[in-house]
């Protein structure tokens, strides 16, 4: 844990990032008020020069070695700035924006200056040991960050595929046609279709449908290309720890190559000390509510990785289908029985939480979830 050094004075920096400008708030030892410096967005040379200048002036004034600790909010800029500053000897923290404690007034002022000064106060409190003021993001390595690209790109392509298919169905539905033509026999099926009032498909609509078909075919080809790249990466790095976990998850019946890759690259590549940490990271822990004589759990926090959370909810439903003899599936049936609706949806989240913990233990220790069926062979190790 990084704390304020009481021997060597420390300069605290908070960087408010935007596309056009960066606002740097600096708290220099010996000065009461923070100093604000505005530089062009992305001008790292100016930022490093500013840091060096602040260090040099503080060192001359105090005749001591000056260290620098900075922070900025996680967002669209990613983590490259963190790596750059770290490489230049600056201790850098990335703040989780939604975790910062704020004033709960109905209307709050919002300016870059207030945000930068607020981050500066949060950073100072965090370095003093008050970790309730905000949460810090664990910065992935460049390799870990790049490994997520494949399954995230596939997710976007699948969404694009669904959008195109829904658009084709919607256009046909406006003409009273409820059947979508097959891609394999597109021309023949489209020529045979008739509108609800007996006409052929209008010329411009036919042209738009043909263009949508070409987009759909290209999207399907890209999905296959991304999946092949994913499979090839697992084959070329069989000793890699992440690839080993993907292969292990793929052995469990009901978990496919894509789910195994998503869970490993998004969750299991990290180290967790206990089950509460991993459930909190995915955001499927219930939020306690205790006041006076009332003490109950409310909805899940949803404060973690949304992609991993969605995957676990989907996997929980699939677990009931493909692992009906497991202890987790039996627990779900005993708890829910024949109930449906809201009760069943609440219980599936609890099942997802238990399943996540069981899979985490499996990838770390090799202990198979109780009653789960394991595939005899792995046809595709990815």
What kind of feature is each model-predicted range?
Residues 2-28, 119:
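Gly/Thr-rich phosphate-binding beta-strand-loop-beta motif of the actin/hexokinase/Hsp70
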Residues 293, 332-382:
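Low-complexity, acidic/Ser/Thr- and charged residue-rich accessory regions of DNA metabolism proteins
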Residues 146-248, 376:
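Glycine-rich, often acidic, oxyanion-interacting loops/wings at catalytic, nucleic-acid
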Residues 44-69:
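Short, basic/hydrophobic alpha-helical segments
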Residues 245-251, 257-340, 344, 379-380:
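Phosphate-backbone recognition surface of nucleic-acid-processing proteins
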Residues 19-46:
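Short glycine-rich, Thr/Ser-proximal phosphate-binding strand/loop in the N-terminal lobe
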Residues 93-136, 190-192, 294-303:
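Short alpha-helix plus adjacent loop in nuclease-associated cores
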